[in-house]
């Protein structure tokens, strides 16, 4: 499956991974959590315990006014739904 991989301090890049839970877990280095912060039909998949584990902070999520409401820690990926 095609994904956009986003790693802390690096430029996001498109890559392919095998479909399935194990591949998603490997990409984010642990248990996965899916969030849907965009209107587009995509999921942001991140490490569910990234902040708790002290993974490096990556990118901020902002609301419609531009205010930060969360920060993703560790690697995350974005993939299309459907």
Where are these regions (language model features)?
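Domain-length accessory/inserted modules outside core catalytic folds
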Residues: 1-82
